[in-house]
UniProtKB/Swiss-Prot annotation:
PANTHER family: S-ADENOSYL-L-METHIONINE-DEPENDENT METHYLTRANSFERASES SUPERFAMILY PROTEIN. Disulfide bonds: none annotated. HAMAP family: 16SrRNA_methyltr_G (MF_00074). It comes from the Bacteria. Keywords: Cytoplasm, Methyltransferase, rRNA processing, S-adenosyl-L-methionine, Transferase. Its EC number is 2.1.1.-. This is Ribosomal RNA small subunit methyltransferase G. It is found in: Cytoplasm. Pfam families: GidB. The keyword Cytoplasm applies. S-adenosyl-L-methionine binds at G78, F83, A129, E130, R148. Belongs to the methyltransferase superfamily. RNA methyltransferase RsmG family.
Length: 237
């Protein structure tokens, strides 16, 4: 998917990018490739692949109608090089985006990236989701939490649901169907008062299958969740 293919496909979906937005995606690509030689951000660095498998893939929840261009508070867990939240932010500038990442070098990249792209209302924090999930400044504060290929739902639910407001939504982007994952996550979702409200499949323009699972938070998360850093992965609920 060339940049021109990307613009044209978005236009067909009803999103006509401004010259500023096109420049932002171009700068994003160039900085991603430049910084990838210093720190491991992605295995995908070829321009057409980045536009398809990072940029287009990241904005899929918008294209599929699951997000609006409103000043909602969105948290991205395990965003790595900023996916999916920063391509979403370029497309929908009204989003207020927060990223938590456990690697300080990635936070340095994201901070520079946001400055170079001229993004406002973006916040980056270095640390573990399990620790921030017990911090009152973060816990129960977000309308949406996104996670792209971060962990299985059984683990992911504990890392994300505590951050949501009641009726807030987890949007999980997956490369594989999540049926088995959701079966395994039933207990975790029950304990965390999360309910799967949508399982959506779609295709990238090249025909690759992708999946979005949306979980809504129904009640306050019990205080003991999330557990200490590392435990959700070692001993899933």
């Amino acid at each position: 998917m060339t940049p021109q293919d990307f613009y044209r496909t978005l236009e067909e979906d009803g999103f006509s990018l401004s010259s500023k937005q096109k420049e932002q995606f171009d700068t994003y690509f160039k900085l991603l490739v430049e910084w990838n030689t210093k720190i491991n951000l992605t295995a995908i660095t070829e321009e057409n692949e980045v536009y398809l498998k990072h940029f287009y893939d990241s904005i899929a929840p918008i294209l599929q109608g699951f997000l609006a261009n409103e000043p909602i508070k969105l948290l991205d867990i395990g965003a790595g090089a900023g996916f999916p939240s920063l391509p979403m932010k370029i497309l929908f500038p009204n989003l207020e985006v927060t990223i938590i990442d456990s690697l300080n070098k990635r936070i340095s990249f994201l901070t520079l990236l946001a400055q170079e792209l001229g993004l406002e209302n973006v916040h980056f924090f270095h640390g573990r989701a399990e620790d921030f999930g017990q911090d009152k400044a973060f816990r129960g504060q977000f309308d949406v939490v996104t996670a792209r290929a971060v962990a299985r739902m059984q683990v992911l639910s504990e890392l994300t649901i505590p951050f949501l407001k009641i009726r807030g939504k987890l949007i999980a982007l997956k490369a594989q169907a999540a049926d088995q994952e959701l079966e395994e996550a039933k207990n975790a979702l029950c304990l965390l008062f999360g309910k799967v409200i949508k399982n959506h499949s779609y295709q990238l323009p090249n025909g690759d299958s992708r999946f979005i699972t949306i979980v809504e938070k129904k009640k306050e998360t019990p205080n003991k969740y999330p557990r200490k850093a590392g435990l959700p992965n070692k001993k899933p609920l």
